[in-house]
């Protein structure tokens, strides 16, 4: 069985596993690892099929979560961005005793819009799947541009994300398609209602992929969780506002003792 790429850096008895989003890899965290590494032992992961974790095709959300768990420390804070937020959430559902706290970033338990739920139109996600087979690299680049749109530093932020993608092998079309299928079909809203661990949700007000309308809906659905909305950030708040992004993570660590 292939191992997934996993790097451990930093110091501190609190372990923090960082899971990236669709199409990307662990390089996206470069802008915050210096701030966090003096407080946490960081676990930087390329999800199966992405970056340096080649040799994986399309996987279900459960299979991806299980694969990451196999290499993870016995206990950690799990932080997932976008698609990575679904993987971290699935880990918390499957093995709650291994998750000290769950942090989701610009993520939704249900990315696709439903009758009663704001999200990405399913036909947009299906369109991305179609475009992937036509023009792989351009589709990924379009998706990256969408993630930073609207912020004051949009161009620079998109460049940082693009650099993270281009610096490593491109994910396979199968892995990318599998990730879009997860975004199109998964709905964890009810499964996350009774999580036993602290649950922190971070959002960008200008996010074009995860609408801010879901924030109060999830505040009602998960009253035990805490939400923070970064006013001038879009889908990648850790890239546009690294210092502000790290503050709630350090506060969470203090609370966990």
Curated annotation (Swiss-Prot):
EC number, as in UniProt: 3.1.1.85
Residues that bind substrate: 22, 82-83, 143-147, 235
Keyword Hydrolase included in the entry's annotation: yes
Catalytic function, reaction form: 6-carboxyhexanoyl-[ACP] methyl ester + H2O = 6-carboxyhexanoyl-[ACP] + methanol + H(+)
Claim: Cytoplasm is one of the keywords in the record: yes
SUPFAM superfamilies: alpha/beta-Hydrolases
Pathway(s) it belongs to: Cofactor biosynthesis; biotin biosynthesis
Start and end residues of each AB hydrolase-1 domain: 15-241
Subunit structure: Monomer.
HAMAP family reported in the protein's UniProt record: Carboxylester
Cited NCBIfam families: bioH, PRK10349.1
Family affiliation: Belongs to the AB hydrolase superfamily. Carboxylesterase BioH family.
Protein name stated in the entry: Pimeloyl-[acyl-carrier protein] methyl ester esterase
Organism expressing this protein natively: Klebsiella pneumoniae subsp. pneumoniae (strain ATCC 700721 / MGH 78578)
Source taxonomy: Bacteria, Pseudomonadati, Pseudomonadota, Gammaproteobacteria, Enterobacterales
Gene: bioH
């Amino acid at each position: 069985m292939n191992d997934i790429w996993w790097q451990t850096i930093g110091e501190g008895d609190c372990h923090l596993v960082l899971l990236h989003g669709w199409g990307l890899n662990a390089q996206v965290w470069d802008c915050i690892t210096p701030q966090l590494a003096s407080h946490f032992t960081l676990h930087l992961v390329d999800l199966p099929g992405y970056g340096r974790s080649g040799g994986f095709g399309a996987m279900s959300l459960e299979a991806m979560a299980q694969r990451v768990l196999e290499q993870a420390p016995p206990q950690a804070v799990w932080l997932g961005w976008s698609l990575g937020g679904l993987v971290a959430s699935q880990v918390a559902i499957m093995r709650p005793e291994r998750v000290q706290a769950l942090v989701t970033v610009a993520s939704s338990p249900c990315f696709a819009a439903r009758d009663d739920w704001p999200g990405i139109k399913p036909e947009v996600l299906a369109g991305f799947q179609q475009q992937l087979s036509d023009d792989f690299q351009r589709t990924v680049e379009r998706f990256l541009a969408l993630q930073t749109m609207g912020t004051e530093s949009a161009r620079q932020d998109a460049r940082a994300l693009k650099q993270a993608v281009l610096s490593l092998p491109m994910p396979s079309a199968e892995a990318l398609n599998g990730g879009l299928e997860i975004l199109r079909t998964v709905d964890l809203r009810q499964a996350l209602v009774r999580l036993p661990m602290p649950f922190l949700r971070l959002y960008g007000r200008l996010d074009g992929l995860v609408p801010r309308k879901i924030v109060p809906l999830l505040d009602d659905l998960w009253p035990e969780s805490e939400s923070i909305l970064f006013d001038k950030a879009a889908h990648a708040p850790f890239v546009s506002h690294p210092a502000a992004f790290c503050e709630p993570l350090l506060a969470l660590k203090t609370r966990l003792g």
